[in-house]
């Protein structure tokens, strides 16, 4: 399995994501939206950065359980309840991201939503990995 990151010059240099990811070989793993909850399915914090970190940790746990590594994540979809807060805290969020994902930047989208199924959740992350 290999990834080729597609970033056309005409689109400018992306910051923290890739415009496209071309894969060859491997199996697809579709990862359900992950929120910042623990084993008892309780949200661990009301802080956005802490929630982002735990949701990403939970997502990576699914990839690992399937026999993969974070570098095999091809696409991330982030749902947030407050885009402005996310933008204000991007530096902190980026630090947590790099601590878990290194400099691996899959195709990514961020969507602001009115709410998530878990009332206290501020972020939910789903993904596709190629194993």
Name each region found by the language model.
Residues 1-57, 61-74, 80-131:
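N-terminal presequence-like segments and the immediate start of the first folded domain
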């Amino acid at each position: 399995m290999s990834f080729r990151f597609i970033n056309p010059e005409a689109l400018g240099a992306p910051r923290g994501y890739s415009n496209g990811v071309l894969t060859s070989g491997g199996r697809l793993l579709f990862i359900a939206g992950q929120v910042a909850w623990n084993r008892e399915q309780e949200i661990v914090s009301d802080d956005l950065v802490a929630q982002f970190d735990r949701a990403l940790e939970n997502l990576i746990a699914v990839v690992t359980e399937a026999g993969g590594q974070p570098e095999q994540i091809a696409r991330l979809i982030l749902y947030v309840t407050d885009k402005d807060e996310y933008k204000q805290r991007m530096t902190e969020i980026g630090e947590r991201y790099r601590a878990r994902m290194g400099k691996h930047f899959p195709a990514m989208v961020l969507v602001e939503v009115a709410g998530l199924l878990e009332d206290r959740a501020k972020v939910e992350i789903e993904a596709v990995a190629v194993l």
